Regions:
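Conserved phosphoacceptor histidine of two-component systems
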Residues: 6-20, 29
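Glycine-rich ATP-binding loops of the HATPase_c
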Residues: 168-181
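Short beta-strand/loop element within the Bergerat-fold HATPase_c
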Residues: 116-127
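Conserved ATP-binding N-box helix of the HATPase_c
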Residues: 26, 91-114, 166
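Glycine-rich nucleotide-binding loop
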Residues: 139, 178-186
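Glycine-rich/acidic phosphate-handling loop/turn and adjacent ATP-lid/helix
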Residues: 128-161, 188
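Short beta-to-alpha transition helix within the HATPase_c
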Residues: 36-43, 55-73
Length: 190
């Protein structure tokens, strides 16, 4: 187990306890204490609350968090997002899928040696719920027979599997494009 995997494993274990404690504080109306608990145990909250990317609170929070992470890494974000409020279940599932795609893009762009560090994000809900993320990349991206990227590294490729799982469970189509140093993934509900 690598050091990063060990750290992540510990973090996941501890997070269950942190969230249980936090849930109890909120249930008891201890909002100030919960806020201080978050700052202490989860880390400083980014100053992203003023950014409004879309009307859906879950999706907006996800976009704010991942775009702030990209900014910290010196990555420019080109985003055009036009999403209305989704149902609670749809919002959660769509948010996880988008987060996986954006996280993969951040990881890929962070590896670039030149100054082409940017990510393009598009999301709309009309005529159908659609999402795309694209980014420059270096190196070779391996794909399977269906054109889906695959990773030979242990512990990598789970984000792609999550995107495929979202598509399967939500009657959505996906398309991965890899050409001329540009990688993109598009997901659209049928």
């Amino acid at each position: 187990m690598t050091e990063a995997e060990k750290t992540l494993s510990i973090y996941r274990h501890d997070m269950r306890h942190i969230l249980t404690t936090l849930s109890g504080m909120i249930s008891d109306g201890l909002y100030d204490e919960a806020d201080h608990f978050i700052e202490k145990h989860i880390g400083p909250i980014e100053e992203t609350s003023h950014a409004k990317w879309c009307e859906d609170g879950v999706l907006n929070s996800m976009f704010c968090a991942y775009f702030a992470e990209a900014k910290k890494r010196g990555i420019e974000i080109d985003a055009q997002i036009d999403l209305k409020r989704l149902s609670e279940d749809e919002s959660a599932m769509f948010s996880i899928m988008c987060a996986n795609a954006i996280e993969n893009a951040i990881h890929a762009v962070s590896q670039l040696s030149d100054k082409r560090k940017f990510i393009r994000v598009r999301a709309v809900c009309f005529p159908k719920l659609m999402f795309s993320v694209g980014n420059p990349y270096e190196g070779n991206i391996k794909t399977n027979d269906e054109g889906v990227p695959v990773s030979g590294e242990e512990g990598h490729g789970i984000g792609i599997l999550s995107i495929l799982d979202y598509c399967e469970k939500n009657d959505a189509m996906y398309d991965f494009k890899i050409e001329d140093g540009w990688f993109s993934v598009r997901v659209a509900k049928r």
